[in-house]
Amino acid sequence: PTMPVDSRIIEDAIRNHSESASPSASSGSPNNMSPTGWSQPKTPVPAQRERAPGTNTQEKNKIRPRGQRDSSYYWEIEASEVLLSTRIGSGSFGTVYKGKWHGDVAVKILKVVDPTPEQFQAFRNEVAVLRKTRHVNILLFMGYMTKDNLAIVTQWCEGSSLYKHLHVQETKFQMFQLIDIARQTAQGMDYLHAKNIIHRDMKSNNIFLHGGLTVKIGDFGLATVKSRWSGSQQVEQPTGSILWMAPEVIRMQDSNPFSFQSDVYSYGIVLYELMTGELPYSHINNRDQIIFMVGRGYASPDLSKLYKNCPKAMKRLVADCLKKVREERPLFPQILSSIALLQHSLPKINRSASEPSLHRASHTEDINSCTLTSTRLPVF
């Protein structure tokens, strides 16, 4: 796990910078200056903190020393600065509002009442990881709030969720577009897993389509919130919507059933939605029966419903992601390779048609306005 940066390092850097700042400093390049123009701290820095001076000068100028505080404090947003407007919807772990904070934002107020000190610290530790996520296919994390309720602030999206496109508006995508949505989603998930973040609630409601079909994944991480607490003891419980939950997560036999492979299973259900236009188990209208059947391995999504023009390699990928034994599922690097091969084998006219959405938003800081759930949540 990534260690939070100690704010003392930043304060030393600011202090040293102000001491050494002079008119000649801009023209010269003294030995103690870093390439960005920041003085290096004179005190030795522990190994895990060596990367602290690596952020750009502009960002550092925004940081004001506030005593001996953990650096995650600099990402805390005062509740009084945020203006909440429309209530967008409720999910498994909280309620989402559209808000204003230096522009449009989405504010997710979490369903954690009176957090214990352990819970609060765990939340802060996770925020330290979430704030380091920057990827074109990931919804941008902007900060957190702790007054009254724990809350997460992210970029706002104007479009619709994949769930809404597929199951409410019934948008007619072409096969190459469906495959590209699958690729971008896998790309975002691969990035999260490389950061050691397990999503735990991957589903079409948490995938947002922005502009030229650019995928944004939201509501990731936050294991603290997506678990039940009993005193100081953390007890995992099934989270998210059951249609997307892996059999081992439904069974809850392990103390922590969440893994990269449980995310892959959920992604497999998203692939199923993309390649059928339907939700799985539509013939079973009893939630408890789905939990029982899937958990025991008696039911699995009906792959005969996949579109007739769904490429064979995609059919294989859907089946592999939905394997009942989690160790048999591929991980995202392998999934991405499969999709890349698949896209390469598509007719060239289709491949070129999808290129604008592949390359338009190549900057990792892509913070264009983007969708949060303006969608009805599924029944299950």
Swiss-Prot record:
Residues 1-67 are annotated as: Disordered. The keyword Zinc-finger does not apply. It catalyses: L-seryl-[protein] + ATP = O-phospho-L-seryl-[protein] + ADP + H(+); L-threonyl-[protein] + ATP = O-phospho-L-threonyl-[protein] + ADP + H(+). Pfam families: Pkinase. Its EC number is 2.7.11.1. InterPro entries: Kinase-like_dom_sf, Prot_kinase_dom, Protein_kinase_ATP_BS, Ser/Thr_kinase_AS, Ser/Thr_Kinases-Pseudokinases. GO terms for molecular function: ATP binding; protein serine kinase activity; protein serine/threonine kinase activity. Keywords: ATP-binding, Kinase, Nucleotide-binding, Oncogene, Serine/threonine-protein kinase, Transferase. Residues 19-35 have a biased composition (Low complexity). Gene3D superfamilies: Phosphorylase Kinase, domain 1 (3.30.200.20), Transferase(Phosphotransferase) domain 1 (1.10.510.10). Residues 8-18 have a biased composition (Basic and acidic residues). Residues 82-341 form the Protein kinase domain. It is an enzyme of class 2 (transferase). The keyword 4Fe-4S does not apply. By itself the v-Mil oncogene has only weak transforming capacity but it abolishes the growth factor requirements of avian macrophages transformed by other oncogenes. Belongs to the protein kinase superfamily. TKL Ser/Thr protein kinase family. RAF subfamily. This protein is synthesized as a Gag-Mht or Gag-Mil polyprotein. PANTHER family: RAF PROTO-ONCOGENE SERINE_THREONINE-PROTEIN KINASE, SERINE/THREONINE-PROTEIN KINASE TNNI3K-RELATED. This is Serine/threonine-protein kinase-transforming protein mil.
